[in-house]
From Swiss-Prot:
It comes from Streptococcus pneumoniae serotype 2 (strain D39 / NCTC 7466). Belongs to the universal ribosomal protein uL11 family. This is Large ribosomal subunit protein uL11. HAMAP family: Ribosomal_uL11. Part of the ribosomal stalk of the 50S ribosomal subunit. Interacts with L10 and the large rRNA to form the base of the stalk. L10 forms an elongated spine to which L12 dimers bind in a sequential fashion forming a multimeric L10(L12)X complex.
Amino acid sequence: MAKKVEKLVKLQIPAGKATPAPPVGPALGQAGINIMGFTKEFNARTADQAGMIIPVVISVYEDKSFTFVTKTPPAAVLLKKAAGVEKGSGTPNKTKVATVTRAQVQEIAETKMPDLNAANVESAMRMIEGTARSMGFTVVD
């Protein structure tokens, strides 16, 4: 018989830098997970993606064992890295802070494809372009 999922914990943690300190420790402690076991496994699995923020979904089972799935970094993080800026615009409709090319958008869309609810790369690109515009970025050809 399959183990029953007791709780789902969703976190966004910098790749390779999970520590028992907040916010990771308290979130996992409340779920009853072995914090050191998770941090070691997460850091080993994400060591090659240093500098990125990795969303992770942790499934906690009734016997307090757990499994986790790492997702692709958020589109906003990938866009900021591609544009070389620290943060998006506070007023995206008035102030544009950076420009990204269609090629960069396509690369990000292909990276995000497994996590996006899109049928093809073109629709994924439109989603990423919308995120870019809402951050105050200009998309150019």
